[in-house]
Amino acid sequence: MKKLKIAAIGTEHRHIFGQLKGMLDLGCECVGWWNDGDNKITDDFSEKYPTIKREMDKNNLLSNPEIDLVLIADIPSKRADLAIECMEAGKDVMLDKPGCTSLDQLKRIEQTVLKTKRIFSI
């Protein structure tokens, strides 16, 4: 069976550590991560996972055909847009809660899932 390859995009909340640990414990391989800027969490992420490459351009992860699933734990108001961008790039997504912060975001997520047939999970 093929090993699931994942990436982390948006590491603004500490839940990313639990999300990633759970997936790694299941045998997934994290091939990279991206965050828009630096903070204590990104510093801790780099320290905890020094062998996972940080990309400075998220498009390097979005365009990588080997990545099956993207973990997202950004600021809540940014999660929906990141998820939509990932699904439009052919990736399934697993978000920290809440997955969206408005009914408009929810509607756009639903439309994207129908259009792309990608998995949106929280």
Regions found by a protein language model. Give the residues of each.
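Beta-loop-alpha module in the N-terminal Rossmann-like domain of NAD(P)-dependent dehydrogenases
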Residues: 39, 49-112
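Short, Asp-centered acidic motifs that coordinate Mg2+ and/or phosphate
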Residues: 32, 68-69, 119
